[in-house]
From Swiss-Prot:
The chain crosses the membrane at residues 9-29, 45-65, 80-100, 128-148, 155-175, 183-203, 227-247, 280-300, 318-338, 378-398, 406-426, 435-455, 457-477. The gene is nanT. This is Sodium/sialic acid symporter NanT. PROSITE patterns: NA_SOLUT_SYMP_3. Belongs to the sodium:solute symporter (SSF) (TC 2.A.21) family. PANTHER family: LD47995P-RELATED (PTHR42985:SF40), SODIUM-COUPLED MONOCARBOXYLATE TRANSPORTER (PTHR42985). It comes from the Bacteria.
Length: 505
C-alpha cells in the first residue's frame, strides 16, 4: 500500500515534540559537572519521576504498537505478564535494592565482583552492553519499518530522527535529562493510548459497550484453552512463569532499570519509584489492549476501510494516520517516537555507565571525575552511532534475520545474569568458581534446549536462571571461598533488614 500523506500540521506536531525533547537535554546539560551527576543525577531525582522513567524505559515503540495488534488478532492473555511484573516488586525492594544502595554502585555489575570476582563482573557488563547496542538497532529498525507504509518519511530519516536526537539529548543531559524526558514520554504514551481508545469508541456504532461486547462474543479476552498447561505454546501458566523470570531479570540484573534505584536521595524515594511504576503498569497497558479490542470492533463494522491483504501488525499506525484528526495524528506518531526514544536513551546512558565503571576505571589509574564524565559522554556517542549504523545496515540490506539471530543469542545471557545475582544474594556458600561453572552450564543448557527441542522460548530464562543457582550451589564445596564470613554477611540477604533500617535512620 502507498504511504499516507502526513500533512503539514502533523509534521508541526511531530517536530514540536522533537524540539521539546532537545530543549530538555540542553536544560539539564548545565548540571552535568561530574560523573556522579551524569550517571546518578547526584541523587536529585524524586521517586515518582524515577518510577515514570522505569515504566517508559521498559515500554518500547514495538510494544506500543504490538500490544493493540495482539489484542486485535488474538486475545488479552499477554496482559497477565504485566501483573506478574508487579508481583515481583516486593522481592526487588526487600532483597535487592538495599544492596545496590548500600554499596553505592554506579554499575550494578560491581556487585558481582565484590561477591564473586572480576570475571563475573565483566561477563555481566559486556553481555549487557552488547545486548543493548543490538537493542538500539532493533528498536530503531523495527520502528522505522512499522511506520514506513503509513507516513511519507523515509525509513532512513526515521532512524536519523530517533537515533541522532537520542544521542544528542543523552550526551547533553546525562541520566537526569534521560529521566525527565522519560517522564514526558511516559505521559505521552499514556495519554495517546487513552485518546486513541476514546476516539475509536466514538466511531463504533454502539460505543464502548459494543466494543467490549463484540470482543466478548468473539472470545478475545481470556479463552478457556489459554488456561491449560503447554510446553510449547504461550498459555497463561507459561506466561506467568516466563514473565516472572523475565521481569526478575529486568528489575534485578539490567543496568538500565537498576540505575533508577540509585538516582533518588534515599531508599524511601526508591520505594516511591517502584510504587509509581506499579501503578502505571497496573493501569496503562489495559488501555493498549482495549485499543486492540476497539480496533477489532471498528474494522469488523467497517471492513471496507482495510486494504486487501493488510498486515495487521501495523493496524495501530494505519488507524492513526487514516482516521485520527490532523494534528492529533502527528502527536500520536510523536508518541510512537517517544516510546522508542525512551528505551534507546536509557540504553545509551546505561552502556556509558557500565563501560566507564566496569572497564575504564579498571584500566585507568585513579581517573578523575571529569575524566570519567568525558569517557561517559564519548561512549554515549559511540554506542548510539553503532546502533544507528547497524539499524541503517539492516534497512539497506534487508538482512534482519541475521541480526535477529545475533540479538536472540545475546538475549540468552539474561538468564545467567539473573541467576548470578540470585546466587550471590541468597546462597551464602556460593563462590567465584562455582558461579563460573553455573554460568557455563546455564549457557550450554539453554543453547541445547533452543536447538534440540520445541520448548517455548519463555522457558529459556527460567532454565538459564535456575541452572546458575543449582550448579553454583552444588559445586560450591569444591572450591575455597575468597570471602570471609563477615564479607559474605555484608553481601548476602542475611543482613538485609539491618541494612534497610540503618539507611532509613
Amino acid at each position: 500500500m502507498e504511504a499516507q500523506s502526513f500533512g503539514t500540521l502533523n509534521y508541526i506536531a511531530l517536530f514540536a515534540y522533537l524540539g521539546a525533547i532537545m530543549a530538555v537535554g540542553v536544560y539539564f546539560a548545565r548540571r552535568q559537572k561530574s560523573a556522579d551527576d551524569y550517571f546518578k543525577a547526584g541523587g536529585r531525582i524524586p521517586g515518582w519521576a524515577a518510577g515514570f522513567s522505569v515504566f517508559a524505559t521498559t515500554l518500547s515503540s514495538i510494544t506500543f504498537m504490538s500490544i493493540p495488534a495482539k489484542a486485535y488478532t488474538s486475545d488479552w492473555t499477554f496482559l497477565i505478564g504485566q501483573y506478574v511484573a508487579i508481583a515481583i516488586l516486593p522481592i526487588v525492594f526487600w532483597f535487592y535494592i538495599p544492596f545496590f544502595r548500600k554499596l553505592n554502585l554506579t554499575s550494578v555489575y560491581e556487585y558481582l565482583e565484590r561477591r564473586f570476582d572480576v570475571r563475573m563482573r565483566l561477563f555481566g557488563s559486556i553481555s549487557f552492553m552488547l545486548f543493548h547496542i543490538g537493542r538500539i538497532a532493533i528498536v530503531t529498525y523495527l520502528t522505522a519499518l512499522a511506520l514506513m507504509p503509513f507516513i511519507d518519511i523515509s525509513p532512513l530519516m526515521i532512524v536519523f530522527l530517533i537515533g541522532v536526537l537520542c544521542i544528542i539529548y543523552t550526551f547533553l543531559g546525562g541520566i537526569e535529562g534521560v529521566i525527565w524526558t522519560d517522564v514526558i514520554q511516559g505521559v505521552m504514551l499514556s495519554v495517546a493510548a487513552i485518546l486513541i481508545f476514546v476516539v475509536i469508541c466514538f466511531n463504533v456504532d454502539g460505543g464502548i459497550v459494543e466494543v467490549f461486547s463484540m470482543s466478548n462474543q468473539a472470545d478475545k479476552y481470556f479463552p478457556a484453552e489459554q488456561f491449560s498447561w503447554s510446553w510449547t505454546d504461550s498459555t497463561i501458566p507459561v506466561l506467568m512463569i516466563g514473565f516472572f523470570f523475565a521481569s526478575l531479570q529486568q528489575f534485578t540484573a539490567s543496568q538500565d532499570v537498576v540505575q533508577r534505584y540509585i538516582v533518588t536521595d534515599n531508599i524511601d524515594e526508591t520505594k516511591k519509584a517502584l510504587i509509581t511504576n506499579a501503578k502505571l503498569v497496573a493501569c496503562v497497558p489495559i488501555f493498549f489492549f482495549a485499543v486492540g479490542s476497539a480496533l477489532f470492533a471498528y474494522y469488523t463494522q467497517n471492513p471496507e476501510l482495510l486494504p486487501e491483504n493488510f498486515n495487521t501488525g501495523g493496524i495501530l499506525p494505519f488507524y492513526v494516520i487514516s482516521q485520527m484528526p490532523v494534528g492529533v495524528a502527528g502527536l500520536i506518531i510523536a508518541a510512537i517516537f517517544a516510546a522508542s526514544q525512551s528505551s534507546i536513551s536509557s540504553s545509551l546512558n546505561s552502556i556509558a555507565a557500565c563501560f566507564t565503571s566496569d572497564i575504564y576505571e579498571k584500566v585507568s589509574k585513579n581517573p578523575t571525575s571529569e575524566q570519567k564524565l568525558r569517557i561517559g559522554r564519548t561512549l554515549t556517542v559511540v554506542a548510539g552511532l553503532l546502533g544507528v549504523v547497524a539499524s541503517t545496515y539492516l534497512i539497506m540490506s534487508n538482512e534482519s534475520e541475521i541480526w535477529d539471530a545475533f540479538n536472540s543469542l545475546l538475549g540468552l545471557m539474561g538468564g545467567p545474569m539473573t541467576g548470578l545475582f540470585m546466587l550471590g544474594i541468597f546462597v551464602r556458600r556460593a563462590n567465584a568458581n562455582s558461579a563460573l561453572l553455573g554460568v557455563v552450564a546455564s549457557i550450554a543448557t539453554v543453547l541445547w534446549v533452543r536447538s534440540a527441542t520445541d520448548l517455548n522460548f519463555f522457558f529459556y530464562g527460567v532454565i538459564g536462571t535456575l541452572m546458575v543457582v543449582i550448579v553454583g550451589y552444588l559445586t560450591a564445596p569444591m572450591f575455597k571461598n575468597n570471602l570471609n564470613s563477615d564479607e559474605i554477611d555484608e553481601l548476602s540477604a542475611t543482613k538485609e533488614k539491618r541494612s534497610t533500617t540503618a539507611e532509613k535512620a
